[in-house]
Amino acid sequence: MTQIKNSTLAPSPKPVSFKEALKFWIKLGFISFGGPAGQIAIMHQEVVERRNWIGENQFLRALNFCMLLPGPEAQQLATYIGWRLHGTWGGIVAGSLFVIPSIFVMMLLSYLAVAHVDIPAVAAAFYGIQPVVVAVVIEAVLRIGKKALKHRVLYGFAVLAFVCIYFLKVPFPAIVALAAIGGLIMKQMLPQVFCRGQFDFNTRECRMEDQSDSFGNLTRPSVAHVIRTFLVCLVLWVVPVGAVWLWRGYSDTLTQIGLFFTKAAFVTFGGAYAVLSYIADFGVASGWLSMPQMLTGLGLAESTPGPLIMVTQYVGFLGAWNIPGELSPLCAGVLGASLTTYVTFLPCFFFIFAGAPFIEAMAGNQRLQAALTGVTAAVVGVVLNLAVWFGFKVLVPDNSVDIFSLSGAGISLLLLVKFHFPIHFLVPVGAVAGVVWKLLL
């Protein structure tokens, strides 16, 4: 995660008009490349350093809160900042505009990926993207592992998670739950390992970051507020998903898409990479898409603005396109993609609007921090499973080594790890290399 300095003498935040903030949120939706680290860095530079709309402590506290939640932390952070500046409507506008540009871009790319894949140049381009994706996932294992695995016990969490998901086929939500319980148990024996603040070895206590700053008077934390927010979001979920259920029936692909991605939205701890194998497992087993198509979708999501979790929209589009029922594939695909995106991000708004008033209490909860330390370590094993799974599919198809894919993955990994080459540039380079290899050599 991007390191952000604390500033002790920062000037007081200045008021900002809704119109001025709206212009920034529109702009952010089109420039939010670079994954969550890049997106969070852009927001910090713009809203804290350059524009001084919120203070450093407020930004850091909001970021810590969003990192505790399932779902894309950068989109949730934008929602929080919008809420902090202009209340509920500010949060809705900020969170929505963060993803709207990528919705249309991914919709177009998803269509090209299935409707025109029989064109040799298009097929070759997608072939070239796949080894880049393998390298991206391997780099994610290295990056997340470096940050999360600070002790041999945490390495044990990662290894057990890999064994459970790769060999024993334990569902991802169960791994999250078991890792959280393990974190709570191990905190009693090794509190210094499961402390996310500063551990005092004399008192054997974990000292969390000072949380004394006020968050203003937007919304007071209360159970009534949480219940109201939950009921509103529940109605907003029931209306479209229920309508599809009544129209198409429970077993229809569109209904299953709505139900599955609702469940997935609540287990995306550790970012999009952590839940990808869960989504890919279900999607491939359900006949929604093939493994090469899943790899293509991840590559497209990496190279477009917006959160990486937008790969779910691609899966929803292809699932409905491939099993459209009596609808046309295009109509079914658009409906599937739209429903997927809606149920993926609706919980994000609920988490922010219901939880932001409780942010100080949550940030200092040591048991919660210990549970999340266990989950974060387990996520490394889950992402490693994804790397192994993708690697075999791409590098050793049909039990024979693919020289182009092996070379492409190796070169891509070198560029990512050694030279920090931007992913959104590397994916198009891979596409061009695939075209050259397939059509010109």
Model regions and ranges:
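Multi-pass membrane proteins that catalyze or facilitate reactions on polyprenyl-/lipid-phosphate substrates
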Residues: 1-69, 80-304, 308-441
